[in-house]
Every structure is written in structure tokens, then in C-alpha cells.
């Protein structure tokens, strides 16, 4: 299977989205289609042996829209994809830029519409509202002048808003009517009725019925109604487009962080400023204080503190010295340094993050399926309701004017856009907010599923703990007379001499502690490993050893009773040291618990989530760790082999409820993939963890709780928008049709209908924008 992303042009509402989806889904070989109305894009999974990108574009064209491939799932990028691969994030065009350009064009249309609408509305409604009008518009002999003036003022409004008519009637011709069709038919009906009235007026004037002609002009001209409908819809579209342009603010901010130029250091030491898109892997670059790092790389010389908050959400700058990795779009705060470029263009962490978020926006949340089904039949149903409304009003009143007023009101008040925007706008804002927090959702489905997770399984190593053993206790042995066997420093020197040649994780922890304290390991002789026990060696005239209780007993070095068990109960592994057959001391090593683990588990509990810890450690050690983070023994799954993690997740799923798995992605990929939602934690710049649905860039367990809160807030926002969109149409359409006329005696004007329709979409987008201010309440 291949996956391609396409730019789709001509979509203006949810009905358009549904028609494109339907047209492509019908093709043989197409497995899934996800159309994003907001971004004007489409993601298609298909079998290249059965269908090609050209076939997909042709299907979209036949549906009345345009499509072009962005980049191919097979790895061969299209034109836009190639540009991104060369230039990376610094030159990526975001949906925000497109929306800002659309808003600018819409503003021009709006200004022209308003300029001509004001005099049109004044002239058309002045006689009804008692406004003063020039005599040429009130004199009965000039009724045709009034009509022609209104028509002339309407023409520029129709001209700048011709897209509604072109797209609307085109969709009708393809048998797939859209919101533009509703507007086009509604406005055309008003204009057609007015032109018909002008013919009647001409006949009346020709036969000397001057007074009747003036009455016809006052009662039967709807030019101002058509102009108002078009102008108000354009007001709504402009506000909607402006609001939508703000939804991608988080990604836009990331793109803006990428510098356009960089300083390349040549072999002779000379420095040259070049465009970022010309940088190649292996080149050496210099970054000065205050500058953004242009590409990913490894520090060669110098040191600095680098602000990585844009990528990871971590507010404290990271210290960078020789050998440390640096990432594009992070900011150098203090010193100057040189680094070698390792990943450039579309391979940088920044470009991958942006692509991941955009791909997530291109997917569809399960909650959107109901809205899509409604949108797919919405417009045809509205046309039927409008036709029925016209016929009923004609039958009841015999008045074409009243029947036309209600029929047009039904057309223009209906709004499938509000339905279509509810999900994608909230998803875009939610995923963008997540990116700001260092939480990357790979799909809209993951964002939705996380909200309903009932159990979170935490892989202990690297998730609850740091994943790297460290020295926790240094205990010097006591002789029979109560004096210490040696000093703490001497014990560490002894340990360093024995462990310098070992590759055991415990040895690495001890050597790291010695290095921190400035202790240099001495050379030893006759070094030997004792399988299952430890190591022995000779240092000068002294025989030294390091190992477990069994080795100490064999050497005659007496270990205090219960000491090993005491450390084990605390989740620590003791390593005993002997010198010339006497116990010299004990160094305990443990995988340290992260500072926020206990707080994070408490936060998850307060969110109503059951927490389990999964580990390969023995139960005694596992329960010791569990106690430190607030978990009971029943919540611990111990003695688990890496290959069995997936089975335990499956068993929890079989017990009922959705399960999320949190791990570092190293040996738990099958478990991450098996879970309803897999979260890879502490990935830093490595965001492409296989099997993970959500990537947590920081090694902070609190981000799991934050991700759940964000998921719940986003889905709650979507439900609010869907409710109000359905409620609006459920009330608005019957009101426009005149269902409540017997009770209220009031008939809705098409102009009010157009205003209400415009505001409904603006309200949906504005509600989604509230997510930009989201702050976790529990996981602060």
C-alpha cells in the first residue's frame, strides 16, 4: 500500500468535503480517504497496482474540484514534497499562509460588497423604513429609475462574489450541490423575482399605470436582499477565514523559528553566510549567542545553553558541550560553538514535527464520521425543504412574494459549514497546542481515543524511573572494634579499580560516580570474573573483590545479616567489596525514580485513570519502586520478559476498557502498538517511534496526564460545536420555513437568514480557538 497527500482546490463547505471523499473512495484500490476542509488537503491510502495518483486527481476533477499530489507515499516526492526535502521547515508553506492569503482576498471582496451594499440597502429599504430619499426615487413617475439604480448597484456585488455562482452552479451540474449552491440559488431567485417585477413595471408604465408601477417596485424588488445575502455571507467567510488562519499558530511559530541563513565554516577557518537550503550533511557551522540553530547536528567545539522549549516544551535551557546533539529551530542563548550538520532539510527534527502535526490534521477522528454523513445529504435535503416550503406557502397564501421569501430564507440560513468545521478546526488547534507542550499526536484518532482511556500501563524502566542506574548508597564496613574499615574515598578507589574493566550496568553506575568525584581508577593485576558471583583482582600485595553475598562468604568476608535484603526491599542492588578477606564496604545502585513520577501517577488517578506498572524486575524490587510512587502491589506486573509485554496489555484490554501503554519505545514497541493508545516518552528529537500513537518529547511522566486532559478538552470542544451546529440548523431551518408563523406571526427575512448562517460558522471557529488558551487543571 502507498499513501499520498494531495492539495485539493475548490472546497468551500462540508458538502464539498463529502463529495471529494465519495468520489475518491469509489475508485478500485483506494483503501481509505481523509479529506481536510480546513487545510484544503487529502490523504489517500491506495494500492499502486490498481490506481495511480493521476487517477485520483482525475476523480476529484470530475467531481468539480481540483487536486494535485504533494508527496508520494512510495517515497518519490511530488513538486512540493521535493521543495520541502531540499529546504526543510525554513521554506515550508503552512496552511496558515494559505488562509491568510485567502483572508486578504476575501477582505477585498468584502470592502467592495459593503461599499455598494450601503447605498443599495438604503435605496431599497428606505421607503419601508421611512428614511429620506431623493425625489427621483419617490416620484411615482420614476419607479423604473429606482429599479435600475438598484440593479446597477447590485452588479458589482455579484461580480466580486461570482465564486458563489460559479462553484454553486458547477456543483449542481455535477449532481453534488454544496453550500455555494444554496447561496447561488437563493440570490438568483431574489434577482430573478426582481427582474420579473421590472418587466411587470415596464408593462404598467407603458399602459399608464404609474402608481401601480411604483407599488410594484416597492413590494416586489429584492435586489437589496440578494446584495445583502452575498455581502453577509462574505462577511462570515472573511471572519471564518481569519479565525481559521489563527488555528495553525503553533506550527506557524515553529516554522518562523527556522532561520533563513546560516554561517558555514570552511576547512581554512573562513566563514560564509549561506541560505539554509544549501546546507549539506557533514558541513561545519557556527552559531553565535541569540541565533537560531539552522539544522540538526553534533557540537564540535565550544559550549552553550540552548533553549529547546520550542521543540520539547522544556523551559530550562539545555547545556551543550562537545559531542552533544543540537536541533534546528532551537535558540543558542550564551556561548558560541561550532557543530557538524547531520540532518538537513526535511530530515530535521523540526521538519518532522511539522510534518507529523500536519499529517495528524489530515486524518479524521471517529467523532467526525457522524458529521460527514449528515453533511453528505444536508444540501439536497435543504433544497427539498425549500421547494416544499415554497409550495406550502403558495397553497396557503397564494402570494409568490411570501412563498419566495420563506423558500429563499431556508436556502440561505442552512449551514453545513458549521458541521464540517467543528471537528477539523478543533483537531488543528488541539494538535498545535499539543506541539507547543511537547506532546505530538500522530493522528486525530489517537487524540480522540486518549480521552476515554481507563487504564494506563507504565513501563518502569525509562518511564517511571530514569532508565539509567545510579549510586544511591555508599556504606563503609565497620571492624570488630567499631572503627571504619576504610574511608569512603578509599572504598570508591577500590571500587573503581575493580569495575574499570567491567561492562555491567552496575559497574557503569559506579564508574560514573567515581568520575563525578574526581577519583581515578588504579591498575590491578590478575583480574578475573567469577560467574554468578562477581570479580576478583590483586592490587599490589592486596587481594580485592567485588560481588554478591555468595562471593563474600566464599572469601570469608562477613556481610551483616539482613543487609542485602534491606537494600532489595528498597529496590536497590547492593555490590559488596572485600580486601584481604575482610568486608570493606557496600555500594548500592538503583534505577532512580524520576522526580515527577509520584505526582504524575497521582494526577492520573485524579483523572479517573487506573495506573499499572510493568517491569522485568523481580517482585520485591518492583514493589519497592511502586511504593515510592504511590502504587499498590496489586498495580504491579513484575517478572515480565520484553516479549510478554504485549500479552499483558492484551489481557488488560480483554478485561474491558481502553488501555494506554507508556514506554520509551526501545523494547516495548509491540506493547505500544497493541494498546488502544501507545505513548512513547522521553524521545527528545527522535519523534518517529514505531508503534507510538503519541510522542512525548520530554522525559516527564506528567505529560501523560497533560495529554489526557488536552484530549478531553479537544473532544469536549468538538461535541460543543457539533451540538450547536445541529441545534442551529434544527431551529433555523424550521424558523425560515415559517413553521412558527402561526405562533409568532413573523416571517424570517432572507437577509436575517444570511446573517445567522454567517455567524454560525464564525461561532464554531471561535469556540475552537479557545483551545489555544488551554491549561491543564490537574497536571499543572
Model-identified regions with their sequence ranges:
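Conserved cytosolic catalytic loops of P-type ATPases
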Residues: 28-46, 50, 54, 221-223, ...
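Juxtamembrane coupling segments of multi-pass membrane pumps/enzymes
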Residues: 201-205, 210-212, 227-289, 320, ...
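Soluble-to-membrane junctions at the N-terminal ends of transmembrane alpha-helices
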Residues: 92-115, 167-190, 354-386, 403, ...
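Flexible metal-binding regulatory segments at protein termini and peripheral loops
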Residues: 1-147, 244, 270-273, 351, ...
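Conserved ATP-binding TGD loop and adjacent catalytic N/P-domain core of P-type ATPases
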Residues: 1, 282, 289, 363, ...
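ATP-driven catalytic headpiece of P-type ATPases
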Residues: 108, 330, 454-503, 511, ...
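Membrane-embedded alpha-helical bundles of multi-pass transporters
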Residues: 129-144, 173, 177, 192, ...
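Transmembrane helix-loop-helix hairpins at the membrane interface
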Residues: 103-261, 373, 474, 745
Amino acid at each position: 500500500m502507498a499513501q499520498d497527500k494531495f492539495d485539493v482546490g475548490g472546497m468551500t463547505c462540508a458538502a464539498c468535503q463529502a463529495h471529494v471523499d465519495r468520489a475518491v473512495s469509489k475508485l478500485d484500490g483506494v483503501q481509505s480517504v481523509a479529506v481536510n476542509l480546513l487545510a484544503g488537503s487529502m490523504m489517500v491510502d491506495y494500492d499502486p497496482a490498481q490506481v495511480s495518483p493521476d487517477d485520483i486527481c482525475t476523480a476529484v476533477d470530475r467531481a468539480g474540484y481540483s487536486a494535485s499530489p504533494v508527496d508520494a507515499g512510495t517515497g518519490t516526492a511530488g513538486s512540493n514534497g521535493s521543495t520541502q526535502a531540499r529546504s526543510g521547515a525554513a521554506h515550508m508553506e503552512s496552511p496558515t499562509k494559505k488562509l491568510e492569503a485567502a483572508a486578504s482576498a476575501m477582505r477585498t471582496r468584502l470592502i467592495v460588497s459593503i461599499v455598494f451594499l450601503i447605498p443599495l440597502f438604503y435605496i431599497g429599504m428606505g421607503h419601508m423604513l421611512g428614511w429620506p430619499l431623493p425625489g427621483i426615487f419617490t416620484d411615482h413617475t420614476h419607479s423604473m429609475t429606482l429599479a435600475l439604480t438598484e440593479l446597477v448597484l447590485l452588479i458589482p456585488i455579484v461580480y466580486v462574489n461570482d465564486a458563489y455562482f460559479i462553484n454553486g452552479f458547477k456543483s449542481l451540474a455535477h449532481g453534488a450541490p454544496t453550500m455555494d449552491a444554496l447561496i447561488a440559488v437563493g440570490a438568483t431567485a431574489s434577482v430573478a423575482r426582481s427582474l420579473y417585477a421590472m418587466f411587470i413595471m415596464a408593462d404598467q408604465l407603458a399602459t399608464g399605470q404609474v402608481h401601480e408601477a411604483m407599488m410594484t417596485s416597492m413590494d416586489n424588488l429584492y435586489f437589496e436582499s440578494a446584495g445583502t445575502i452575498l455581502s453577509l455571507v462574505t462577511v462570515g467567510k472573511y471572519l471564518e477565514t481569519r479565525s481559521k488562519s489563527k488555528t495553525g499558530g503553533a506550527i506557524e511559530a515553529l516554522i518562523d523559528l527556522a532561520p533563513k541563513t546560516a554561517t558555514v565554516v570552511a576547512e581554512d577557518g573562513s566563514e560564509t553566510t549561506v541560505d539554509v537550503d544549501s546546507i549539506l550533511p557533514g558541513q561545519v557551522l557556527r552559531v553565535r549567542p541569540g541565533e537560531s540553530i539552522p539544522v540538526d547536528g553534533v557540537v564540535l567545539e565550544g559550549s552553550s545553553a540552548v533553549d529547546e522549549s520550542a521543540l520539547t516544551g522544556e523551559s530550562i535551557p539545555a547545556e551543550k558541550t562537545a559531542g552533544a546533539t543540537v536541533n534546528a529551530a532551537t535558540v543558542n542563548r550564551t556561548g558560541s560553538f561550532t557543530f557538524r550538520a547531520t540532518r538537513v532539510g526535511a530530515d530535521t527534527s523540526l521538519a518532522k514535527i511539522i510534518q507529523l502535526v500536519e499529517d495528524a490534521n489530515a486524518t479524521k477522528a471517529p467523532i467526525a464520521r457522524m458529521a460527514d454523513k449528515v453533511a453528505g445529504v444536508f444540501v439536497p435535503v435543504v433544497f427539498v425543504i425549500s421547494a416544499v416550503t415554497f409550495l406550502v406557502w403558495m397553497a396557503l397564501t397564494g402570494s409568490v412574494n411570501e412563498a419566495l421569501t420563506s423558500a429563499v430564507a431556508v436556502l440561505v440560513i442552512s449551514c453545513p459549514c458549521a458541521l464540517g468545521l467543528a471537528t477539523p478546526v478543533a483537531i488543528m488547534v488541539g494538535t498545535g497546542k499539543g506541539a507547543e507542550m511537547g506532546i505530538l499526536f500522530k493522528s486525530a484518532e489517537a487524540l480522540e481515543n486518549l480521552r476515554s482511556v481507563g487504564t494506563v500501563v507504565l513501563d518502569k524502566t525509562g518511564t517511571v524511573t530514569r532508565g539509567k542506574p545510579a549510586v544511591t548508597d555508599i556504606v563503609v564496613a565497620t571492624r570488630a572494634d567499631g572503627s571504619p574499615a576504610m574511608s569512603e574515598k578509599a572504598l570508591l578507589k577500590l571500587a573503581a579499580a575493580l569495575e574499570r574493566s567491567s561492562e555491567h550496568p552496575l559497574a557503569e553506575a559506579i564508574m560514573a560516580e567515581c568520575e563525578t568525584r574526581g577519583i581515578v581508577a588504579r591498575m590491578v593485576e590478575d583480574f578475573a570474573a567469577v560467574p554468578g558471583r562477581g570479580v576478583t583482582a590483586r592490587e599490589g600485595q592486596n587481594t580485592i573483590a567485588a560481588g554478591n553475598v555468595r562471593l563474600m562468604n566464599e572469601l570469608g568476608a562477613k556481610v551483616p545479616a539482613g543487609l542485602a535484603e534491606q537494600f532489595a526491599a528498597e529496590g536497590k542492588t547492593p555490590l559488596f567489596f572485600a580486601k584481604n578477606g575482610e568486608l570493606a564496604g557496600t555500594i548500592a545502585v538503583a534505577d532512580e525514580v524520576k522526580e515527577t513520577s509520584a505526582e504524575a501517577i497521582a494526577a492520573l488517578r485524579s483523572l479517573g485513570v487506573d495506573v499499572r506498572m510493568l517491569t522485568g524486575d523481580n517482585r520485591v524490587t518492583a514493589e519497592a519502586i511502586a511504593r515510592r510512587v504511590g502504587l499498590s502491589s496489586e498495580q504491579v506486573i513484575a517478572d515480565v520478559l520484553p516479549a510478554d509485554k504485549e500479552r499483558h496489555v492484551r489481557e488488560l484490554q480483554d478485561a474491558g476498557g481502553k488501555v494506554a501503554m507508556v514506554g520509551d519505545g526501545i523494547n516495548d514497541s509491540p506493547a505500544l502498538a497493541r494498546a488502544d493508545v501507545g505513548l512513547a516518552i522521553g524521545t527528545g528529537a527522535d519523534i518517529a517511534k514505531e508503534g507510538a500513537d503519541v510522542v512525548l518529547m520530554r522525559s516527564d511522566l506528567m505529560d501523560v496526564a497533560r495529554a489526557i486532559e488536552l484530549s478531553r478538552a479537544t473532544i469536549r470542544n468538538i461535541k460543543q460545536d457539533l451540538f450547536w451546529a445541529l441545534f442551529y440548523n434544527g431551529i433555523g431551518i424550521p424558523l425560515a420555513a415559517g413553521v412558527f408563523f402561526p405562533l409568532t406571526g413573523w416571517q424570517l427575512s432572507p437577509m436575517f437568514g444570511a446573517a445567522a448562517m454567517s455567524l454560525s460558522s464564525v461561532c464554531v471557529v471561535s469556540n475552537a480557538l479557545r483551545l489555544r488558551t488551554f491549561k491543564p487543571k490537574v497536571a499543572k
